[in-house]
């Protein structure tokens, strides 16, 4: 396992944004607004129910999730890489590493404002 993130992992969140993203992921997991794994993230994008996509930059090989940024750009959904798949797995509430996760849409959600705040920050990274 390498300590340097893959250069293909762009945009990579800084430490503060990573913490904020993982906090929202944890809350979304409790609210049943989270899909874990590259396959489920792909399904949410195809169904049009994804707010944003989080991917792990230390995924090995990184190519197994590089179809997601292309799909995100087609569907106009923001995406971001976080440095650690283990931290993403913990935030998702599972004991295994998670390489991709999707926050899903729910207008009646209690954490809607936090989701939109993080979504805006991710969108500024993509510009």
From Swiss-Prot:
One of its GO terms (biological process) is mRNA splicing, via spliceosome. Keywords: mRNA processing, mRNA splicing, Nucleus, Ribonucleoprotein, Ribosome biogenesis, RNA-binding, rRNA processing, Spliceosome. It is found in: Nucleus, Nucleolus. One of its GO terms (molecular function) is RNA binding. The keyword Ribonucleoprotein applies. GO terms for cellular component: box C/D methylation guide snoRNP complex; nucleolus; precatalytic spliceosome; small-subunit processome; U4/U6 x U5 tri-snRNP complex. It comes from the Eukaryota. Common component of the spliceosome and rRNA processing machinery. In association with the spliceosomal U4/U6.U5 tri-snRNP particle, required for splicing of pre-mRNA. In association with box C/D snoRNPs, required for processing of pre-ribosomal RNA (rRNA) and site-specific 2'-O-methylation of substrate RNAs. Essential for the accumulation and stability of U4 snRNA, U6 snRNA, and box C/D snoRNAs. Belongs to the eukaryotic ribosomal protein eL8 family. Component of the U3 snoRNP particle. Binds to the C'/D and B/C motifs in U3 snoRNA. Component of the 25S U4/U6.U5 tri-snRNP particle, a subcomplex of the spliceosome. Binds to the 5' stem-loop of U4 snRNA. This is 13 kDa ribonucleoprotein-associated protein. It comes from Eremothecium gossypii (strain ATCC 10895 / CBS 109.51 / FGSC 9923 / NRRL Y-1056) (Yeast).
């Amino acid at each position: 396992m390498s300590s340097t993130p893959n250069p293909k992992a762009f945009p990579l969140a800084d430490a503060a944004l990573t913490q904020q993203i993982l906090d929202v992921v944890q809350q979304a997991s409790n609210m049943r607004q989270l899909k874990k794994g590259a396959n489920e993230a792909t399904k949410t994008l195809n169904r049009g129910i994804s707010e944003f996509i989080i991917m792990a930059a230390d995924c090995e090989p990184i190519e197994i999730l590089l179809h997601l940024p292309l799909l995100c750009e087609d569907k106009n959904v923001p995406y971001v890489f976080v440095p650690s798949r283990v931290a993403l797995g913990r935030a998702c509430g599972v004991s295994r590493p998670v390489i991709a996760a999707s926050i899903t849409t729910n207008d009646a959600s209690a954490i809607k404002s936090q989701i939109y705040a993080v979504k805006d920050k991710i969108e500024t990274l993509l510009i």
